[in-house]
């Protein structure tokens, strides 16, 4: 369909593989046309020794487990400086353990099931991998008892793993977040950038550290010291939303002045009476 010249423009949200297939087909058209693509992420959060850990833990939990971790902006990896790593892990485990999982139409439940059996099996496989090669700090189980056994319900999971483990690189799209210790903010940023993706990235730390983080991080959407966690455009009428690298292109913010011009055609008019 995208190869048809009658298609004036395309906005895509989905996997990198499908997105790149679409972009290539679209580029082979008879003339250039606007194309916006959002194609996944492996979103990182950096926590410095100067961070407000309560705020950081709250933001990470909201970002990692909101909508069952099945949103493009979800945090899935955390790099924390060693002096505060133990305290942050304890807070994350505590807050994660308080999450109520169940029927998402009921107000008492904050998290519902994962999308389908494929995601459910991927979760179980990843949790088993972490039990063997890392550590489970909270969760790590499929919820099979009682009425939850009739759906694809899993526990929100906080885990640790060696920094070279494959789960730090692979997009999971699950309620699963890894936490790793680093020696410095600089090392954390290097690890955050060592990914094919670059959609969202968060930072919790001191005011003086913020410019350094924002200058070096490779992500299209950034947030700093935000207790609500990752944003899909906190102010969508004013902020562009989109990624770098394999995460796609910036500019996806419906209704904003960053978005609309990409689907407008300029015409210069000179009229002489």
Tell where the protein language model's regions lie, with residue ranges.
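Conserved C-terminal structural/oligomerization subdomain of aldehyde/semialdehyde dehydrogenase
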Residues: 6-7, 11, 46, 58, ...
């Amino acid at each position: 369909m995208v190869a048809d010249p009658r298609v004036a423009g395309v906005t895509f949200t989905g996997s990198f593989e499908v997105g790149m297939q679409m972009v290539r087909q679209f580029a082979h058209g008879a003339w250039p046309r606007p194309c916006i693509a959002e194609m996944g992420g492996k979103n990182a959060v950096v926590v410095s020794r100067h961070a407000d850990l309560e705020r950081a833990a709250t933001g990470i939990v909201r970002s990692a487990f909101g909508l069952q971790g099945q949103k493009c902006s979800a945090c899935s990896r955390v790099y924390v400086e060693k002096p505060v790593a133990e305290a942050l892990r304890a807070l994350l485990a505590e807050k994660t353990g308080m999450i109520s999982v169940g029927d998402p139409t009921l107000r008492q439940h904050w998290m519902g099931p994962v999308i389908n059996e494929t995601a459910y099996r991927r979760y179980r496989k990843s949790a088993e991998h972490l039990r063997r090669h890392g550590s489970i700090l909270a969760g790590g189980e499929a919820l099979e008892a009682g009425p939850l056994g009739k759906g694809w319900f899993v526990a929100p999971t906080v885990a640790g793993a060696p920094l070279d483990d494959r789960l730090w690189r692979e997009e999971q799209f699950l309620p699963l977040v890894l936490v790793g210790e680093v020696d410095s903010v600089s090392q954390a940023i290097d690890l955050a950038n060592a990914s094919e993706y670059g959609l969202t990235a968060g930072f919790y730390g001191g005011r003086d550290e913020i410019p350094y983080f924002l200058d070096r991080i490779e992500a299209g959407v950034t947030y700093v010291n935000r207790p609500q966690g990752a944003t899909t455009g906190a102010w969508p009428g004013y902020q562009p939303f989109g990624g770098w690298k394999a995460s796609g292109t910036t500019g996806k913010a419906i209704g904003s002045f960053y978005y609309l011009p990409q689907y407008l055609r300029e015409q210069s008019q000179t009229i002489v009476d």
